[in-house]
A protein has these predicted regions:
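Long, contiguous, secondary-structure-rich segments that constitute the structural scaffold
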Residues: 27-43, 47-134
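Long, low-complexity segments enriched in small/aliphatic residues
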Residues: 1-32
Length: 134
C-alpha cells in the first residue's frame, strides 16, 4: 500500500460523478433535457468561496498541473472544504453537437492520468486543482 497524495494548501481534490438527467453523458445534446437542466457549475464549499471572494454564478478559473477551464461556481455546504465537484461530460468541442457545443467545461481538461494498480481504471480522485475568481 502506498500513501495517497494529499492536496497542498490552496489545492482541492477534483471530484466528478454522474448526474441524474443524463444517461452515461450520451444525452447532453438532447434539446429537451438541455432545456430543463441546471447549467454546469463547479461546487465550492461556502468557507472556501468566502476566502476567495466567490459567490454562486461567479466565473471561476480552475487549474490543474495539466490544464485549465473556466466555469460558473455553485457555493454550497454540500461538499467538503478540501474538495470541488464538476459534472463530467460537458465542454464538448464538436460543433456537430449543436445543443451541447461549448456548454460548460470539460473535467477531462484537468484530470491527470493515474491508473489504479488493482482495477486498471483511471484513479480520478488524485487530481488537485487551484481556484481563482476569473
Amino acid at each position: 500500500w502506498e500513501e495517497p497524495p494529499y492536496p497542498k494548501p490552496g489545492e482541492y481534490y477534483l471530484l466528478t460523478g454522474k448526474v441524474g438527467q443524463h444517461t452515461q453523458f450520451a444525452t447532453q445534446n438532447n434539446q429537451l433535457l438541455h432545456k430543463y437542466e441546471d447549467k454546469p457549475r463547479i461546487w465550492v464549499h461556502t468557507s472556501v468561496a468566502k476566502t476567495l471572494g466567490i459567490i454562486t454564478d461567479d466565473l471561476v478559473r480552475v487549474t490543474s498541473l495539466v490544464g485549465e477551464v473556466i466555469l460558473a461556481a455553485l457555493v454550497t455546504e454540500g461538499i467538503r472544504p478540501d474538495c470541488v465537484y464538476m459534472a463530467p461530460g460537458y465542454g464538448h468541442l464538436s460543433k456537430g453537437l449543436v445543443t451541447a457545443y461549448a456548454h460548460g467545461a470539460s473535467d477531462s481538461e484537468l484530470h491527470m492520468t493515474f491508473t489504479d494498480p488493482i482495477s486498471g481504471g483511471q484513479a480520478l480522485t488524485q487530481t488537485f486543482v487551484q481556484l481563482e475568481k476569473a
